[in-house]
Amino acid sequence: MDRDGEGDLADALWMTSTDYLTPTTLSLVRLDGDGELLAVEPLKAAPAFFDAEGLVAEQHFATSDDGTRVPYFVVRREDLALDGTAPTLLYGYGGFEISLTPGYSGGLGRAWLSRGGVYVVANIRGGGEYGPAWHQAALKGNRHRAYEDFAAVARDLVARGITSPQHLGVQGGSNGGLLTGNMLTQYPELFGAVVVQVPLLDMERYHLLLAGASWVAEYGDPEDPAELEQLLRFSPYHLFDAGRTYPPVLFTTSTKDDRVHPGHARKLAARMLEAGKDVTSYENIEGGHGGAATNAQAAHMAALAYTFLWGRLT
């Protein structure tokens, strides 16, 4: 870049970009004197780890219970038959003003997309996709809005013919594990399999374990009777009903998680197993909140989730 405004690169800029189907790419963007785009010249890209030919990424909107339009991304084969049979993985987070934006994952591409699976990312309230107001709309007693948004996306996928409940799985970790824990306990009829990773699940005691006290502003204070009542409405451990039918569930956690205590996953898995439900639980003895200490362990944890979901959704 010519900082003096003269020379061949005076009206040019460097741009780094990525999406679900494109590895991170550095490009030179050339502009005319009025700032209008002349050309985008890709210069260097990270390696591709799967064949994206014939795959497309698109954005749709679902309507939540209160009428809010909720955006979500779908990555699928361009020639996908809309007959409701595609194994579909729905991912979400919905908390702490964190935005889920498009990004490239070689593991996802090789393990899921290349096999004909559909991948969906829901940009539900609680996240930061539309700024602070989008986050604040799902704080504390309004947490139900995040879960209603996610369920609305699940229903919209079925309505579009992309998938059906028996072929639709969900995955989320940490706050996203609380999300998928609520999908498991509040909306079991919408899903064929659920993956709950390093989750919060006991919202009555979360503030007493590890970093839990630092999240009171997000979820609510269990020591306040009014807020505890609200917390119990989205506490999967307390919402579990032994007499209800649930989809197969995989819990994953880490013994050395220093943020969300592994006891959350342990106690709901134990309660469900005692009730005779279809539960798989895996606890890595290394790694922190990410669940793995090495790349090999991370690959193993990812493979566990993809294998579990593929085996139950196809």
What are these regions (language model features)?
Residues 18, 91-95, 174, 254-257:
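Glycine-rich His-Gly loop
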Residues 81-87, 91-130:
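Short substrate-entry loop that stabilizes the transition state in hydrolases
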Residues 10, 23, 83-85, 165, ...:
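Short secondary-structure junction motifs
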Residues 1-81, 98, 107-110, 114-115, ...:
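Non-catalytic accessory segments flanking enzyme active sites
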Residues 56, 68, 86, 164-166, ...:
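Exposed loop/turn and edge beta-strand positions of beta-sandwich/beta-sheet ligand-binding modules
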Residues 26, 62, 72, 90, ...:
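Conserved hydrophobic/aromatic pocket- or pore-lining residues that grip, position, or stack substrates
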Residues 121-314:
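Active-site-proximal cap/loop segments of hydrolase catalytic domains
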